[in-house]
A protein has these predicted regions:
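DNA major-groove recognition helix of helix-turn-helix
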Residues: 36-37, 65
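Alpha-helical residues within the helix-turn-helix
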Residues: 13, 24, 52
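Short alpha-helical DNA-recognition segment
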Residues: 16-34
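Short, basic-rich loop-to-helix N-cap that marks the start of a DNA-contacting helix
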Residues: 40-52
């Protein structure tokens, strides 16, 4: 099973929000943001800060994808 953050990037487009703006609002470092872009693991704390900054639920920014 792997995590996908495609929903996060779609949400940013829908909100017309720049990556730098989210990083500042959620207090997320550039290296952590690149982990998200590359589908790598990040801490739950980071995900919750992003949800708080975007006023959304965690299911709106990520999904679990089963490997076949």
């Amino acid at each position: 099973m792997e995590l996908s953050y495609k929903r996060l990037f779609k949400k940013l487009i829908d909100l017309d929000m720049q990556h730098n703006e989210l990083m500042e609002k959620a207090n997320v470092s550039r290296s952590t943001f690149y982990k998200l872009k590359n589908g790598e693991n990040v801490t739950t704390d980071v995900l919750l800060r992003i949800c708080d900054a975007l006023d959304c639920d965690i299911s709106e920014i990520m999904e679990c994808i089963k490997n076949d």
